[in-house]
Amino acid sequence: MTQRKNMYSKKNSFGRSDFPEGFLFGTASSAYQYEGARNEAPRGESVWDTFVRKYPERNCYSNADQAIEFYNHYKDDIQRMKDINMDAFRFSISWPRIFPLGKKSKGVNKEGIQFYNDLIDELLANGITPLATLFHWDTPQALEDEYSGFLSEEAVDDFKDFAALCFEEFGDRVKLWVTLNEPWVYSIGGYDTGRKAPGRASKYMNEAAVAGESGLEVYTVSHNLLLAHAEAVEVFRNNPKCKDGKIGIAHCPVWFEPYDSNCPKDIEACERAMEFMFGWHMDPTVYGDYPAVMKKSIGKRLPSFTAAQSKKLRGSFDFVGVNYYSAFYVKNIDEVNHDKPNWRSDARIEWRKENNAGQTLGVRGGSEWDFLYPQGLRKFLNYAKNKYESPKFMITENGHCDIDYEKKPKLSNLMDLQRTEYHKKHLQSIQQAIQEDGVVVEGYFAWSLLDNCEWNAGYGVRYGLFYVDYNNGLKRFPKMSAMWFKEFLKREEEIEDSEEEEYVLKSTMNKKRFLLATGSSASCFIPKMSESSKALELLF
């Protein structure tokens, strides 16, 4: 055993202690994707409820009425977080669960408030720091019906009322907040390509779309989202209960590399792509205005801020949330069809999975856009640090997907070596950015604790550290990635007592790699792992 301890001593490996004191490690979720209980707990309709029911063929014939029933199982799931040594959890507060009809004046759901109070209290009782997201795409359908949601500036005041109530009810205990989750995705997907709720786009962008105007509505919606963010931050900073709290936007940058590294136009296109994707929502919160390249390209279709709005937006964040998954090559486009405007043609870019030499950026994951490129996260953090005068960052999402529409055997889903490697390499990139580059990163949230309803991709895409058996009562089972995090996150005082367990884990992973290479059966090498007090087995 002495030799084993020397070989696998935690002190000589990568772990929690390699990060700054107080660095948060957690997992992320969203209300629509997790909560479920649609038919038993009061909640108003969201645009996603309507979209998936109205257009099932555009949503893999799935909905989130049940989701993974986090509403009823959150206590057990919090024990799972605790069991793998996580110390934070990011969740979203469902706007239509709090205001079923979208407006405070039309009724507040006390049961919804109680649910989030109970969730927050349970997290804190288990030593887990809550991070709450106010808007994770679930616009109340009532507001969509009344004034077309965020296409109207009326949404700003209703969102402000929602945010104010959340700060008042939960701000004494929740000290980390995200106003908007991925405004780029919400605007592009919902109003330019029409692939996500509410599914609006021009016919030349999406034949299935029944209404919308690509290249116009996308900018209007993002503009109103930014105004709503600024109002919410002002309310937050004026509420005594939120004293010492921090707030920001969860952006979703993709890192870009030039399609042809020797082509000046492709190199320039990478910078333009970053401005159109990240700068679009970041610049207004720093400088009070959109990037110059966007204003020049889009012209009158891009709304402008008043002096008062600009002032309110500047400095409206305490940290920059980063949802990073992958990277792409970018090719410059010289000529575009101005009669068919859209975000990508305005940016004059084309995303490519391979460069001019036929190379990908890394190993492909479960989806066509999911490439393992952890150095892209480090490059992005340095890009944003240098451009925006060293803000503080929070990695609010980072994850790897498996595709499971064919219902793969449970074993192959649980032995998620590629996901384990994905998280490890991205954490290494973050650690390098902190220690070698001087980037200030304060936390990391893996997407996601559990497999869940992945929006219009349904349940066939799995991101969880825990496997959810959709055909067996939504039972949860830890994957190898959960086991890895459990070991990675052990604190120094826990290490000496766990070296034998760690040896078994590492031996199993090495044997599994060998078995994958040789095609042999893996069943005899799978270790057992107790899950909290329930003593569930990893595999059975």
From Swiss-Prot:
The keyword Ion transport does not apply. GO terms for molecular function: beta-glucosidase activity. It holds the Pfam family Glyco_hydro_1. The active site is at E182 (proton donor), E397 (nucleophile). Keywords: Glycosidase, Hydrolase. Its EC number is 3.2.1.21. Signal peptide: none annotated. It catalyses: Hydrolysis of terminal, non-reducing beta-D-glucosyl residues with release of beta-D-glucose. GO terms for biological process: carbohydrate metabolic process. A beta-D-glucoside binds at Q33, H136, N181, E182, Y325, E397, W447, E454, W455, Y463. InterPro entries: Glyco_hydro_1, Glyco_hydro_1_N_CS, Glycoside_hydrolase_SF. Gene3D superfamilies: Glycosidases. Belongs to the glycosyl hydrolase 1 family. PANTHER family: BETA-GLUCOSIDASE 27, GLYCOSYL HYDROLASE. This is Beta-glucosidase 27. It comes from Arabidopsis thaliana.
